[in-house]
């Protein structure tokens, strides 16, 4: 629809930033968490007022400052090299809250052209009458891959982390049966104990420096 057209134009305009964040994810590690948190405060889901002005604990330098500089040039934020960041819109805040990783997936899938794919999907389970959200799904030769994108940190709360994995496994099985494949794409590192649990649920993981292997992973799966 038209809405999709607008979204794609926006995603295209910031594709270089999106690509940089995904391909070099391990360089930004904790800064992703910081941006995620500030964007969350700005969007303020409990209240309905958007609060675009947010404060960092310290003025970023080096590669983090470079990232903010790129974002400023793209009109996503206002930033004067200090601790204050002003998100230009709700959409810009949503991008930094994690939307960028979904755009990364969209951007890469568009280049690979599997048979069918969608990002930011709502699925209805007829049995349970429950609507579920799915970050991305790819269908190729009658096989389904369900992708979950995460930009917040893993490792602080194991129960919550395993919960993400369980939910992804459940969702994929509901949509595509037990033969569906599942991928957790994380901008932040994931520890071995969580990877072990993911294996038990047959969930693949690409995290931090592995994110740049996303295209290779998809091509391999398509040939499967």
Write out the residue ranges for each language-model feature.
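Intrinsically disordered, low-complexity Ser/Thr/Pro/Gly-rich regulatory segments
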Residues: 1-224
């Amino acid at each position: 629809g038209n809405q999709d057209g607008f979204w794609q134009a926006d995603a295209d305009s910031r594709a270089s930033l999106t690509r940089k964040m995904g391909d070099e994810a391990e360089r930004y590690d904790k800064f992703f968490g910081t941006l995620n948190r500030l964007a969350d405060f700005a969007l303020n889901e409990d209240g309905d007022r958007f609060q675009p002005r947010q404060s960092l604990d310290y003025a970023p330098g080096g590669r983090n400052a470079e990232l903010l500089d790129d974002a400023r040039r793209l009109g996503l934020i206002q930033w004067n090299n200090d601790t204050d960041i002003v998100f230009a819109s709700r959409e810009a805040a949503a991008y930094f809250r994690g939307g960028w990783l979904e755009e990364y997936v969209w951007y890469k899938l568009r280049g690979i052209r599997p048979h069918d794919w969608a990002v930011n999907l709502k699925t209805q389970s007829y049995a349970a009458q429950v609507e579920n959200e799915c970050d991305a799904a790819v269908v190729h030769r009658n096989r389904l891959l369900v992708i979950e994108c995460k930009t917040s940190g893993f490792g602080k709360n194991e129960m919550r982390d395993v919960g993400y994995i369980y939910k992804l496994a459940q969702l994929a099985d509901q949509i595509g049966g037990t033969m569906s494949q599942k991928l957790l794409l994380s901008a932040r590192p994931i520890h071995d104990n969580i990877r072990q649990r993911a294996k038990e649920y047959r969930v693949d993981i690409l995290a931090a420096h592995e994110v740049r292997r996303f295209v290779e992973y998809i091509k391999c799966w398509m040939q499967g």
